[in-house]
């Protein structure tokens, strides 16, 4: 499990993700020529405010994997 801190809307937020999910998040950031923080910011801006950000990140990664498997 890896814990990272990012700034979202001017507030520091900690996110816990399994190492495998964090590795994939870094991979997608590199492929997209952006930062992990930018991907997390985009996910945060588009999520239901009542949902858990770490869970939303996992779902986003799963959707990316499903896109590439088609």
Give the label of every model feature segment.
Residues 25:
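Aromatic/hydrophobic pocket-lining residues that form π-stacking "cages" and hydrophobic walls in ligand
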Residues 16, 35, 52, 56:
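Amphipathic alpha-helical recognition patches that constitute DNA-binding helices
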Residues 48-70:
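C-terminal structural segments of small proteins and small subunits
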Residues 1-16:
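Short Lys/Arg-rich basic patches
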Residues 14, 20, 31-45:
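Amphipathic, hydrophobic secondary-structure cores in small proteins
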Residues 4, 47-48:
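Membrane-interacting alpha-helical segments
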